[in-house]
Swiss-Prot record:
GO terms for cellular component: Golgi cisterna membrane. This is Galactoside alpha-(1,2)-fucosyltransferase 2. Keywords: Glycoprotein, Glycosyltransferase, Golgi apparatus, Lipid metabolism, Membrane, Signal-anchor, Transferase, Transmembrane, Transmembrane helix. Residues 29-340 are lumenal. It comes from Sus scrofa.
Length: 340
């Protein structure tokens, strides 16, 4: 009996010490779990504020939001590049966000109107081409003005600009679905060429104000034939704000021309997406076509020398700053201007 009782005997002192130690460790673990997020937050804050790649810069830069899609893309890209160049944070106005954000994955933050009204802005006018003085623009609170849309401002950041103007998935997929369904004489095309024909108000403004012309039937025939001579079974996807004129003046008898755009200037996402998803571009005049070609990449044909030498338009516009050097120009026919 004594031997059995002895075998079940357990010292109380060590047992109490064990329970106390285990309890202490458990409560310490619980406390560490509760305070761990605070430690993590402090570490993230420290990394964010001390990182040399994201300094807290003084001031605020923005730009006017004027014109339609092509103009505002040029304004956005110019603000993006010049603010970076001058070491200032960039913000876009709400109306620019409303134009671009439904189409593209832009990242610049929005400056709300209530905030903008309280800021002592310094307006700084830009020409439509890069100048050395724009690398050193003075002022902490600067509003850039003008109609800048030149690769000379932002082409050194091409990869970033293309990323800013990445189409939303649903916009891109709708365009690609349409293109996949196209056929040239029963066969799937090997090459897709976007064709943008700018008409609208330019039909009257160019000859009457700027001593210039818009693209005519002859130019478009030459441009399409240029691609036909170099690519097998191309398809030409035509977008325009003058689709009726295009149907009458672009020869579609070969079965390789598709009049795809809806030509609605107020909702240009569909037309623009179709053009950018093509391999190459035929453009006429205007920033819409310039940006479509810039985003599409590939080879681009454009209408060259479409104003008289004494045109006042050339005081505001430099062709060499608008069209990339590798793009190919076809001379405009200025004879209609010379008759008057």
């Amino acid at each position: 009996m004594l031997s059995m009782q002895a075998s079940f005997f357990f010292p109380t002192g060590p047992f109490i010490l064990f329970v106390f130690t285990a309890s202490t460790i458990f409560h310490l673990q619980q406390r560490m779990v509760k305070i761990q997020p605070t430690w993590e937050l402090q570490m993230v804050t420290q990394v964010t504020t001390e990182s040399p790649s994201s300094p807290q810069l003084k001031g605020m830069w923005t730009i006017n939001a004027i014109g339609r899609l092509g103009n505002q893309m040029g304004e956005y890209a110019t603000l993006y590049a010049l603010a970076r160049m001058n070491g200032r944070p960039a913000f876009i106005p709400p109306e620019m966000h409303s134009t671009l954000a439904p189409i593209f994955r832009i990242t610049l933050p929005v400056l709300h109107a209530s905030t903008a009204r309280r800021i002592p802005w310094q307006n700084y006018h830009l020409n439509d081409w890069m100048e050395e003085r724009y690398r050193h623009i003075p002022g902490e609170y600067v509003r850039l003005t003008g109609y800048p849309c030149s690769w000379t401002f932002y082409h050194h950041l091409r990869t970033e600009i293309l990323r800013e103007f990445t189409l939303h998935n649903h916009v891109r997929e709708e365009a690609q679905d349409f293109l996949r369904g196209l056929r040239v004489n029963g066969s799937r095309p090997s090459t897709y060429v976007g064709v943008h024909v700018r008409r609208g108000d330019y039909v009257h403004v160019m000859p009457n104000v700027w001593k210039g012309v818009v693209a005519d039937r002859r130019y478009l025939e030459q441009a399409l034939d240029w691609f036909r001579a170099r690519y097998r079974s191309p398809v030409f996807v035509v977008s325009s704000n003058g689709m009726a004129w295009c149907r009458e003046n672009i020869n579609a008898s070969r079965g390789d021309v598709v009049f795809a755009g809806n030509g609605i200037e107020g909702s240009p996402a569909k037309d623009f997406a179709l053009l950018t998803q093509c391999n190459h571009t035929v453009m006429t005049i205007g920033t819409f076509g310039i940006w479509a070609a810039y985003l599409a990449g590939g080879e681009t044909i454009y209408l060259a020398n479409y104003t008289l030498p004494d045109s006042p338009f050339l005081k505001l516009f430099k062709p060499e700053a608008a069209f990339l050097p590798e793009w190919i120009g076809i001379e405009a026919d200025l004879s209609p201007l010379l008759k008057h």
